[in-house]
Amino acid sequence: MTDHGFALFETAVGLCGVAWGRNGILGVQLPEGDATRTRARLRRRFPQARETEAPEPVRSAVGAIQALLSGEPRDLSQVALDWTGVGAFERRVYEVARAIRPGATLTYGEVAARIGETPLAARDVGQALGRNPFPIVVPCHRVVGAGGKSGGFSARGGAATKLKLLRIEGAEAAGPPTLFD
């Protein structure tokens, strides 16, 4: 792959972005409202990257992301990611999330159990997912709170965006948490 670049691309949920380096995708950016804001977010996150045409492996990943966000089930688990700067705990969490198929969900506690942690680590799992640099490719939106509650989501629109992504994939979540959840 070419050295550090980024590109914007249209999806059914809005204009997204992707940044890449020699070892794979560095990050995915969900829509920020318009091209200017999405581009600015990518430039802040990846100051070493310049806007350019994506190389073939990235174009292939973008096509799969576009299809998934249009409601076509796609497996993105083979998309090459550049794990530089991702901690060991986060990587374990992201690898479990990558294995969740479209239309399915796991709870934060179930992810914690799958990486060998106690249920008390569910909050740590949520924090790791909140730092996910690869949304959609690492489908953090498929991890929900206990009882099917949506839980948080760090992208623009918060839990409403998470619920929209789950609906596109045909998954169910109970909605945003209330004061009593």
What do the PLM-derived regions correspond to, one by one?
Residues 93, 145-146:
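N-terminal alpha-helical segment
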Residues 131, 137-138:
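Major-groove DNA-recognition helix of helix-turn-helix-type DNA-binding domains
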Residues 146-181:
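…primarily DNA-binding HTH/wHTH and HhH modules…
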